[in-house]
């Protein structure tokens, strides 16, 4: 659980005993842990090799020793359960090693680009839902004898929201097209996730503001969009990590 963004700092261990892998450790923030029938677990198989000593395993969740400790109570994305799990002498067949021994980190990193593009798309979707709710409300809510959307202050907010959503969408599509074509897109995926996730929080905040007091009520969906948007800056690599990756890739930027 302590590894966080420092992925190589895993504490879960896997030991080969009598032809079977035995896993011990704990994992935090496991998405859909209560619903999954199969978990991909990363564990240290050789502590002397650092990040080259991490391997990936396929672990059926009904395996003895695989225990779900609790479901977390989150401010957002409540449709997806998030769990903490413990592996206590969890024994699996040797064939459940995913890929090669010591290649676990490579397997994890190979999926990050797609994951980050997916989170960028999620952020765009949340922001668009918030924008459309605000746009509809601005047409229906009348103040000072006209819909609030006709007041310049609200119109300017809506214009900014619309522009930022489209910019994030194009960044996301660009990264997705590169990945679909099999081209490198580490920086592009990070740019899409960074911009889209921070954009989503801004847009959802403005959407809530446009709704006024009603936006703060659970009867209106914008409060949910606001809560759901925040996680996109955290999982699949926090915004701070994305900035580090983008800056690192600038070393190869051709002038």
Where are these regions (language model features)?
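Compact, aliphatic and Gly/Pro-tolerant "microcore" segments centered on a short helix or tight beta-hairpin
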Residues: 1-32
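Short Gly/Pro-enriched turn/cap motifs at secondary-structure boundaries
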Residues: 1-5, 29-32, 46-48, 74-81
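Alpha-helical interface subdomain recognition
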Residues: 7-9, 16-21, 84-86, 103, ...
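Flexible, small-/acidic-enriched active-site or ligand-binding loops
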Residues: 9, 62-93
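Conserved hydrophobic/aromatic beta-strand scaffold that supports enzyme active sites
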Residues: 11-13, 38-42, 56-58, 82-89
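A short core secondary-structure module
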Residues: 20, 24-68
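Short, glycine-/Ser/Thr-/acidic-enriched flexible segments
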Residues: 28, 35-36, 46-48, 62-64, ...
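Long, acidic (Asp/Glu-rich), low-complexity accessory segments flanking structured domains
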Residues: 89-107
């Amino acid at each position: 659980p302590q590894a966080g963004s420092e992925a190589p700092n895993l504490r879960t261990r896997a030991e080969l005993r009598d032809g079977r892998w035995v896993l011990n450790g704990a994992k935090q923030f496991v998405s859909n842990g209560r619903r999954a029938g199969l978990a991909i677990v990363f564990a240290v198989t050789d502590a002397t090799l650092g990040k080259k000593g991490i391997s990936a395993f396929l672990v059926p969740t009904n395996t003895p020793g695989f225990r779900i400790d609790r479901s977390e109570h989150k401010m957002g994305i409540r449709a997806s359960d998030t769990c903490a799990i413990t592996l206590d002498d969890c024994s699996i067949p040797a064939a459940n090693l995913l890929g090669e021994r010591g290649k676990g980190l490579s397997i994890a990193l190979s999926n990050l680009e797609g994951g980050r593009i997916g989170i960028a798309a999620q952020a765009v979707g949340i922001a668009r839902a918030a924008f459309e709710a605000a746009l509809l409300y601005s047409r229906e809510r009348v103040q000072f004898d006209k819909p609030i959307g006709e007041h310049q202050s609200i119109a300017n907010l809506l214009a900014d929201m619309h522009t930022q959503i489209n910019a994030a969408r194009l960044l996301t599509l660009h990264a997705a097209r590169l990945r679909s074509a099999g081209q490198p897109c580490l920086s592009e995926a990070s740019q899409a996730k960074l911009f889209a996730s921070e954009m989503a929080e801004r847009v959802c905040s403005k959407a809530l503001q446009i709704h006024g007091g009603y936006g703060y009520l659970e009867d209106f969906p914008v409060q949910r969009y606001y809560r759901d948007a925040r996680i996109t800056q955290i999982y699949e690599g926090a915004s701070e990590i994305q900035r580090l990756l983008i800056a690192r890739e600038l070393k190869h930027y051709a002038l």
